[in-house]
Amino acid sequence: CGEIITRATYQNGKYHFDTGAANSKIDEINNTQATLGKSFEFKTHDGSVIKTTDAGSYGWKISKKQAGKTLTNTLVANKQTVNAKNDIYGKGYNQQGTGYNTTSNNGIGDTYAAVSLADQHAWFYKDGKCVLSTDIVSGTNNKDNETPKGVWYIMYQQTPSVLRGLNDDGSKYASKVQYWSPFTDSGCGFHDASWRHDWSKQAYLAKGGGSHGCINMHPDVAGQAFHDLQKNEPVIIY
């Protein structure tokens, strides 16, 4: 810690450290290692490598303000190393960040869910092994309802649940589902859709044929998907 502290004073029985020089080091870490707000290189199910959008909520960054406090406390305690875990922050439901201890697979790890909007298909991975592969129906293909691309994370899980929102005409809806795993603050998530009749791969292209943004799953597989997922697990939508 000492090499990034440029000035220290002692007043009224307290140490005061200038941790401003640490900001450039934190910037370096955030630019080279942190994952929040960045696109990811991701290998899809067929081996092709894509670049995700940077619009997702998955990832972490180090807070300069909080890191300065941690460095000060570390120096006062005369320690040589510091744990930055408490200095990271995230976006959305989990403000503490996600994936901080994950370095494999470009920071995504080996346990995740991936959804191809073009293929209308989802894959669920556990420790690098695909445990479920299933067709889905995503949000209707328009600016108001399309499922947002990016790398997100499972915020929490509920069984059962009631999903509430507005239809395109402004009317309210309340849909009962057995399995609910949201991954965006705007209300997109995985859930069973017992009311759906059209499960074709073209359903989302028709007007009103897709969902309001969620990943609709057939009731026959929704339960397995729910149990394969876990809180904070990455969700790649591409």
Model-identified regions with their sequence ranges:
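Surface-exposed, secretory/extracytoplasmic low-complexity segments enriched in Ser/Thr/Asn/Gly/Pro
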Residues: 1-175, 179, 229-231, 236-237
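Exported/periplasmic cell-wall-interacting domains
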Residues: 23-24, 38, 165-238
